Amino acid sequence: MSNKSNDNGRAYEFAFINELGRIATQNQNINIEKNSSYYVVEKSWSTLSDLEKEKYTKSAIAGINLITSLEPIIEDGNGVLNLKIQADNKGELGDIRDILIQRENINWEIGLSLKHNHFAVKHSRLSHKIDFSEKWFQLPSSQNYWDNILPIFEKLEIYKKDKIKWRELSNKEDCIYYPILKSFIAEIKEKYDKYNSIVPQRMVEYLLGYFDFYKIISQDNKKLTSIQSFNLRGTLNKPSKKRKADIFIPVANLPTRIIDIDFKPNSKNTVELYLDKGWQFSFRIHNASTIIEPSLKFDIKLIGVPATIICLETPWEE
């Protein structure tokens, strides 16, 4: 993502945590942890115009109204309600939640992953130095995979030294994207043939993290806030002592089988993955810089989810 997109995402986190603190303050004690990550998102918020701040606030309020209907402990619990912005590097460690909401006295915690005008799941990379199979599945990549991709990335290393720009490569899809993705597909198939259900399960855990969460997406052009539940371990949607949630969130199961993985029709830079239980992903590979570098970035999206992933939308109040 661009620096502007990153700043917008951080500003949205600031709007959300502060509006949540304001709304939830009624009849209870709130603690917003002022850690280094909080000051980073506050700085991004300060770069917005007044009109942008108004939009972000409206989106946050709409999302908060939905979250409190799904999680009654936010408003009904005893003790201090702690709110915390997580550091960006948590995602590399398997925790993609941006905001944590906690009640330490009852050992309760939920997490939110916030997106501003985009639906990407993750932006992983492929390179000659990254063992994606080890990172995704905890299974080292095969020698065949390295033998196929290393010559391509060595060529990119030479282009980098010559300061050649990506736009100057007229055949990058045929000579770079397609063969790298072909090796990527072959490696996943090889691992699945050998290790079966471990591969799809660990892939989804890598992409979505090891903690349950709600994904909250601000769609500014539609003036909508969307929420998706990722309740893979049954930790979301708990009742408070006073009431149950307004909407029931079922537990979603991890996949156990790869149905198919192949190139998207008529594409040389996008792979589609179909798993059982309704999970579907797309992996679009692209360059993320002007000058060629020996590293390529994925734009990974969920294009299909199980019926147990609840998707809700709410319009902003004018």
Swiss-Prot record:
Reaction catalysis annotation:
Endonucleolytic cleavage of DNA to give specific double-stranded fragments with terminal 5'-phosphates
Q: What class of enzyme is it?
A: hydrolase
Q: Give one GO biological process term.
A: DNA restriction-modification system
Q: Which superkingdom is the protein from?
A: Bacteria
Which Enzyme Commission number(s) are on file for it?
3.1.21.4
Q: Mind listing the UniProt keywords for this protein, alphabetically? A: Endonuclease, Hydrolase, Nuclease, Restriction system
Q: What Pfam family is a match, any one?
A: RE_HaeIII
Molecular function per GO: type II site-specific deoxyribonuclease activity
| Name used for this protein in its record | Type II restriction enzyme HaeIII
Q: What is the lineage of its organism?
A: Bacteria, Pseudomonadati, Pseudomonadota, Gammaproteobacteria, Pasteurellales
Which gene is this protein's source?
haeIIIR
